[in-house]
């Protein structure tokens, strides 16, 4: 969608821009300059006391989306049960259709959830497990998902196969082969991260899915960090299930996620919650969670508008540029350990860095106490360092300050 089409299709609810002080078309024309990103930064109410390089847990909401959220809260509160009974589902369907265009799949295969954890749990707990079935996952997968698999394995008497994803693979084939060699006759499901949350490495999901399907194995993709981060289409991945959190890189309000279920699995999966027992129902039967903040769901539409205004590719390029700004000069420093690949197709914003002789928690503390840089320490098998996660509001000077801090600490 080009900028003219976008401006024409903006929903009224989203035109609460702090950019109202700007002329939007002229503002977008500055997209190739730092002026553009400074105006994006102005759309965020940032704490001036420290540099925030931890956008991986939760993306701060820009003012336009936040203003829209406040309006939606007022609307729902004003209408009360009238909204919940008469309008909630209609608006949810509208948001779902809009979102499906962004993620690249049919709205018939997509539901809104509260986060990736809920999405992946719906699949892991909803499959028809048989004693002896096998699940494959990696040490680098999200910790809570590993625990859920262990719990499910204990409950249904399943086996698990755990592998290690290399931080610096030679090529896609090395990754695909790793998963392929782990498959046995009893393997039913592979859980795989689209982007490894602790290193930022992007895995070749389509190739893994195609390979797994040759063995009759289903693939559940953890895409927590992917929607709104870099461009791809869920349909093109050829996966069976895909979960993501929209309060991360799409910058929707907290408690917004998605679950994609390939249509061929709609009747085979049991929902976590249910309003009825009709297994002939479509994707909607997986979306019932009881009463929850409906205004968060409506605000997803405003988050999409802001994302499209930024430009999907423009945002991805900017995030990768910020990554390169600090990682490339440090790649050959023998005291600094980068746990993220050097191939641009394998990363975007997120990277992980360690310094020899310093624990991840020590490095994180030094960065915050001495340099006022906030990040998160990661101490996991094969990955010991700090996860660095800039955002669209991060400017060049902040990245350079961080880079210089690492060099000073390493020296």
Where are these regions (language model features)?
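Pyridoxal 5′-phosphate
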Residues: 2-411
